């Protein structure tokens, strides 16, 4: 399951998702992409109802996405990096997993990050924030790969970079 949190269709992280998918499909894997931009996922209101019911009271697309996350063997989290953290779309999705995140066990996880910054070390804060969910909250989660898509600012700029090959190969070996 590839989760593209890019707010832009054809944005850099979204383009790398497609390359990852090509590689994974070449390896014979069945892959589904969720482009969060096309789904309605409201912010968590902190009401706490889900603590006892394991269901969110909000009527949006999160239940459908959550089912896919629970059933996936592999989850790719892809986000542009804004101010050295994940974008709002991915953070909102993660916050909304509270009712069922304990059902997401033994997942293999990958991260695809894109940023204008050219120094991959500066993206570690973003990786750590995603790991706070995947490795610290999901039982048995195993981190399988990270793509630091650095040095890309303009929409689609990543297409002329070596990051494309890296994304494809990461998918191929997923």
Predicted regions and their residues:
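Short, highly charged low-complexity linear segments
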Residues: 78, 107, 136, 149, ...
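Cofactor-binding loop segments of dinucleotide-utilizing enzymes, especially the Rossmann-like FAD-
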Residues: 3-5, 36, 113-116, 149
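Short, glycine-/small-residue-rich phosphate/pyrophosphate-handling segment
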Residues: 88-89, 101-146
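N-terminal beta1-alpha1-beta2 submodule of the flavodoxin-like/Rossmannoid cofactor-binding fold
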Residues: 1-78, 84-100, 142, 156-174
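Short helix/strand-capping connector loops at secondary-structure junctions
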Residues: 145-155
């Amino acid at each position: 399951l590839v989760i593209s949190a890019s707010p832009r269709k054809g944005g850099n992280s979204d383009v790398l998702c497609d390359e990852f998918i090509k590689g994974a499909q070449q390896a014979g894997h069945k892959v589904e992409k969720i482009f969060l931009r096309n789904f309605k996922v409201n912010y968590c209101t902190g009401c706490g109802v889900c603590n006892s019911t394991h269901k969110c009271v909000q009527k949006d697309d999160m239940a459908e996405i959550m089912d896919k996350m629970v059933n996936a063997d592999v989850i790719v989290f892809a986000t542009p990096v804004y101010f050295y953290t994940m974008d709002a779309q991915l953070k909102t999705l993660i916050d909304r997993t509270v009712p069922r995140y304990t059902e997401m066990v033994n997942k293999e996880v990958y991260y695809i990050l894109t940023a204008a910054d050219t120094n991959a070390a500066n993206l570690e804060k973003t990786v750590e924030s995603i790991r706070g969910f995947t490795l610290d909250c999901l039982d048995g989660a195993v981190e399988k790969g990270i793509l630091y898509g650095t040095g890309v600012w303009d929409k689609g700029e990543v297409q002329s970079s070596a990051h494309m090959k890296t994304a494809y190969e990461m998918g191929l070996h997923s």
